[in-house]
Amino acid sequence: MTIDDRKIKILQAIINDYIHTGDPVGSRTIAKKYNLGVGSATIRNEMADLEDMGYLEQPHASSGRVPSNKGYRLYVDSLMENQLLTPEENLKIKQYIIDTAMLEVDKIVRQTSSLLSELTNLTCVIQTPSVNKSFIKSLQLMKVDSTTLVSVIITDAGVMKNHIIRVNSTPTIEELNKINAVINRRLVNLCIEQINLQVINQLKEDLQGYDELFNALLTPLYETLKNAADSPDLIMEGATNIFNYPEYNDIEKAKEMLSLLNDKESLRDLLKTNKDITIRIGEENYKPQAKDCSIIAAEYSFGDRPIGTIGLIGPKRIDYSKVISIMAEIVKELNNILNNQSK
């Protein structure tokens, strides 16, 4: 059996209605609310065919139909229409651009997560920038007092790492300028993951005569490398939003969702994407705790290099068209903000 134009229009109407009401949809509802040019008896027969084809499900014998995972997938891939942002949504995004223009990267990411959660009424999870793929833009030693220095490591993505260094006696300002020049000549434009024992030994040769300072400098370098090897952190906003949907009045579904939101490793796996926007529905999420939800994920980038991922988590009946429009616009602006900061 093939899915013809009439079945497609009926399926589209059912999914749109279910997304906005959360109630199983009957043939009379479609006949009354949508001008499809056919009566409820014809719609009922077509709905039975759509169920046989796997696009609809009937949760209870006496109820209407709801979309299946297969139905949602067809809807997302082929049937949903682009939705423009409202003036209020555009205004909030413009304010976000202004508010984050001069912030550090971690604060920008946190505000991004908060805005996405607010505008979509979903749970937002953002993977913070991955340091190991970043390049060192600057490493500066600055004198605090006669026995204390602070090292400031800045990556090309704007991530800053500060470390206090204790020595018996700090170099003079003139010596410090020379040392900074040597360090930056050796390390600037190196990817964090390229800093290996060979590079460290070369730096040691460059800093002959400053053995105490070199040994002290190893600590912040080691910490930076260790942080790079660690899994990127996750920022979550709107964790309770998802429980406003009646689907999660079911205690078992609520437990599964709580389990997922507390499982950082699973969340990192589910956020993986190599596309502008990835949509996974139900069992496409390949994690048992996520089988009843949808996850929309997108990369954000510094230049052409992806540095993190944004994910929105909600029930399968989320308003895909609206959410995708909001996600695409905010990711675009986030990329612009990060790239403008580097100039």
UniProtKB/Swiss-Prot annotation:
Keywords: Repressor, Stress response, Transcription, Transcription regulation
UniProt keyword DNA damage, yes or no: no
Domain of life of the native organism: Bacteria
Biological-process GO terms, alphabetical: negative regulation of DNA-templated transcription
Keyword Transcription regulation among record annotations: yes
Molecular function as annotated in GO: DNA binding
Signal peptide: none
Protein task: Negative regulator of class I heat shock genes (grpE-dnaK-dnaJ and groELS operons). Prevents heat-shock induction of these operons.
PANTHER family, A to Z: HEAT-INDUCIBLE TRANSCRIPTION REPRESSOR HRCA
Family assignment from sequence similarity: Belongs to the HrcA family.
Protein name, entry field: Heat-inducible transcription repressor HrcA
Species for this entry: Clostridium botulinum (strain Alaska E43 / Type E3)
Lineage: Bacteria, Bacillati, Bacillota, Clostridia, Eubacteriales
